[in-house]
Every structure is written in structure tokens, then in C-alpha cells.
């Protein structure tokens, strides 16, 4: 389990603005927050692209087989906020929530050494951050075994799902079986949607990378400045499921 207060502190820190113009970041508050949070961890910035920050625990070498976790940091909100709403959190969480969940796993060293983390921009328009990530890893001579994309969704909110699995693209049958088997304790508490709305998994799959999206269900308009509601129970379980899926996709 991940320390609850650590997660909430990180979520508060990264629920700040981040914009791009399709070529580079133009508002970098969240970029700065990510860099600050990771300063005292084992993770090093291995590639800075105009629309992506790539982190790993060790330098990559040609021929390395890596597992990619991708969480976009761009947002469309005019005003970002994070508030406590009792059993729920309320805020502009597309996509600061998954940024925080990923950072929490990194800070507490819950991911394998062969994981590469990409904080990407431009997802809300053309996903150029994802494209730059693939190109950068290709230039390093790495093989990307799989990609786990992190995002938020309205799917599963009404049914009380803790998380959803979406857009499984190119995941082999054995890996899929292992994933479902490992989630037995969540039986009835997560939703699965094979063909969901487009996200970065589609872009990684276009490059032949087996991809899967882990989403957290929220209530409300995803891109509205009034924010969304997110169950606290979902928040902490999402962090745990993230590290579990990462270990199975490595």
C-alpha cells in the first residue's frame, strides 16, 4: 500500500497548469512540479523532448528491452484545483490524478528497473508527446515490450468501479489471462472496455507496441473547469493496481 498522505500531497502539487502549442510546452508549472518531486529519487531524466520527459532508474543501452508507462501532463483547464469532498476528491484531474499515482509509485520505488516513464504533452490534441517518446526510445536502440497508458474516464463511475481497463491493443492472450487472474480480488469492482475513446494507447499501438490503458473513473465533465468527483477508495487502489500491471507487462 502507498502512504495516503504522500499521495494527496503529490496530487496537490501536480494539479497545476500545463499547456503546449503542439511543438513545445508553453506553460510548465506541472513540468516543474514533476521535476521537483523526482529530484531526490533514483529516477533520472534520460531524455527531454519538446513535448515529453522520459525517466528511468538507470541509463539505457542499445538493445535494452523496456516497459513504458505513459501519463500525459497537458491539460485544457483555465483554472486547476484539488479539493477534499469527503468520500471523494474534487478537482481538475485530467490528467493530474494519474500523474500523481505514477509519481507516488516512483517515489516509493514500486516499479521494476526496466520501466521507462514518459510524462507527455499534446495528448489533448495530436499526441505528439507520445510520438516523440517512441522516436526517442528508438534512437536509443531500445525495444519497447509494452506500454501502459494512464488516464481518467467517465466509464465505470455510475457502477462504482474502482478502475477500468481500456483499449487493450496487441496484448497477447497469456498476458491478458495473467492480468485478469491477478485482479480476482477486485471482482465486480472494475470495468473492462475493449474499444474505448482514443488515447495514447492508440498511438503506441500504431508503432507496433502492445498497449493497455488503466483509467480511474470520475463523475462530471472531464474537461470542465468545475472539476470532477473521484472516489478516495479508487485513488489508493489505482496506485496499487498500477504497480501490479506494470510488473505483469514487463
Model feature map: region roles:
Residues 19-21, 85-93, 192, 229:
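A short glycine/serine-rich beta->alpha loop
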Residues 71-75, 150-154, 217:
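Short glycine-enriched loops at secondary-structure junctions
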Residues 67-69, 118, 146-148, 210-214:
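Hydrophobic/aromatic beta-strand patches that form the interior of the parallel beta-sheet core
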Residues 60-61, 74-77, 124, 155:
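A short acidic, glycine/proline-enriched capping/turn motif at secondary-structure boundaries
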Residues 9-62:
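A non-catalytic alpha/beta surface segment that caps or lines the substrate-entry region
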Residues 157-250:
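Active-site-adjacent substrate-binding region
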Residues 89-174, 180-181, 188-203:
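Acidic/histidine-rich catalytic neighborhood of metal-dependent amide-processing enzymes
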Residues 40, 47, 63-119:
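Active-site metal-coordination/substrate-binding segment of hydrolases
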Amino acid at each position: 500500500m502507498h502512504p495516503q498522505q504522500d499521495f494527496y500531497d503529490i496530487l496537490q502539487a501536480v494539479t497545476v497548469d500545463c499547456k503546449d502549442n503542439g511543438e513545445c510546452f508553453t506553460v510548465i508549472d506541472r513540468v516543474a512540479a514533476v521535476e521537483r518531486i523526482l529530484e531526490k529519487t533514483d529516477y533520472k531524466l534520460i531524455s527531454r523532448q519538446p513535448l515529453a520527459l522520459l525517466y528511468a532508474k538507470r541509463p539505457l543501452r542499445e538493445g535494452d528491452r523496456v516497459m513504458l508507462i505513459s501519463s500525459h501532463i497537458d491539460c485544457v483547464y483555465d483554472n486547476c484545483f484539488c479539493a477534499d469532498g469527503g468520500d471523494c476528491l474534487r478537482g481538475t484531474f485530467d490528467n493530474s490524478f494519474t500523474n500523481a499515482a505514477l509519481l507516488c509509485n516512483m517515489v516509493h520505488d514500486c516499479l521494476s528497473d526496466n520501466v521507462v516513464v514518459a510524462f507527455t504533452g499534446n495528448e489533448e490534441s495530436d499526441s505528439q508527446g507520445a510520438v516523440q517518446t517512441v522516436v526517442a526510445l528508438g534512437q536509443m536502440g531500445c525495444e519497447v515490450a509494452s506500454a501502459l497508458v494512464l488516464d481518467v474516464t467517465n466509464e465505470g463511475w455510475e457502477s462504482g468501479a474502482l478502475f477500468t481497463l481500456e483499449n487493450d491493443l496487441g496484448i497477447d492472450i497469456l498476458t491478458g489471462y495473467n492480468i485478469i487472474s491477478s485482479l480476482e480480488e477486485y471482482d465486480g469492482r472494475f470495468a473492462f472496455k475493449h474499444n474505448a475513446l482514443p488515447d495514447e494507447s492508440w498511438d503506441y499501438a500504431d508503432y507496433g507496441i502492445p498497449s493497455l490503458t488503466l483509467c480511474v473513473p470520475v463523475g462530471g465533465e472531464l474537461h470542465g473547469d468545475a472539476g470532477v468527483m473521484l472516489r478516495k477508495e479508487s485513488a489508493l487502489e489505482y496506485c496499487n493496481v498500477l504497480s501490479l500491471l506494470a510488473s505483469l507487462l514487463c
